[in-house]
């Protein structure tokens, strides 16, 4: 993770939890590129963008690097990791884990290649590390998590349509359809919102 600022309010901006989304091969790379654009803007203009001492911004440019770089499909390894953990905690290569279906919020085991998520939550090292990270950086002020995906023109948020996160996104993406995170089964952002108390999308 890359940190900008040292405020008590925390923003976690996460990208490419699916190395392959649904538009074209390795389209998660566009999300990684967007993360790098954000990092460049923060490096060059942090003082103009954010009041000193107000926010700590963490950018995680690629949550699923093995899926992005070693995967080959949006319906298995690529969208998912290229491995999973067995009962002994060892890597088993083959059907990987859909990291965005593997968090302990409304978790339901999925066996299809596209959304395979193991027999229990957090059966991938990336998901375990991500959960620990989000818990460890939580601030004493506002906590916001943005899990960036692509292509569906929807803004999936906690806090409803009147909440601050949806209102901020709707100002810039008014064409996007509103969806609630509350129904997300194993979603990273749903877990952050309803278990860890982040405002999330």
What are these regions (language model features)?
Residues 1, 88-95, 182-189:
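Phosphate-binding glycine-rich loops and adjacent basic patches that engage nucleotide phosphates
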Residues 1-8:
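Short beta-strand-to-loop junctions in surface cap/lid or active-site-entrance loops
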Residues 6, 105, 183:
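Functionally engaged cysteine thiol sites
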Residues 9-18, 146:
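Short beta-strand element of the alpha/beta-hydrolase
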Residues 10, 143, 199-200:
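Structural motif
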Residues 12-14, 98-101, 201:
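Active-site-proximal beta-strand elements of phosphoester/diester hydrolases
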Residues 20-166, 170-171, 175:
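Active-site/substrate-binding loop(s) of hydrolase catalytic cores
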Residues 175-201:
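C-terminal regions of proteins
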């Amino acid at each position: 993770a890359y940190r900008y600022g040292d405020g008590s309010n925390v923003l976690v901006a996460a990208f490419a939890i699916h190395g392959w989304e649904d538009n074209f091969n390795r389209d998660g790379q566009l999300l990684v590129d967007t993360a790098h654009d954000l990092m460049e803007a923060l490096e060059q203009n942090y003082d103009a963008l954010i009041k000193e001492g107000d926010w700590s911004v963490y950018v995680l440019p690629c949550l699923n690097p093995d899926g992005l770089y070693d995967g080959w499909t949006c319906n298995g390894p690529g969208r998912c990791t290229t491995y999973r953990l067995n009962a002994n905690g060892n890597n088993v290569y083959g059907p990987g884990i859909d990291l965005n279906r593997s968090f302990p919020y409304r978790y339901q085991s999925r066996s299809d290649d596209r959304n395979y998520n193991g027999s229990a939550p957090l059966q991938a090292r990336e998901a375990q590390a991500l959960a620990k990270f989000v818990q460890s950086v939580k601030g004493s002020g506002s906590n916001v998590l943005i899990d960036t995906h692509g292509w569906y023109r929807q803004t999936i948020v906690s806090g409803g349509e009147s909440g601050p996160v949806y209102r901020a996104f709707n100002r810039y993406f008014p064409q996007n359809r509103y969806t609630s995170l509350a129904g997300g089964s194993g979603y990273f952002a749903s877990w952050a919102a309803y278990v860890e108390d982040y405002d999330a999308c």
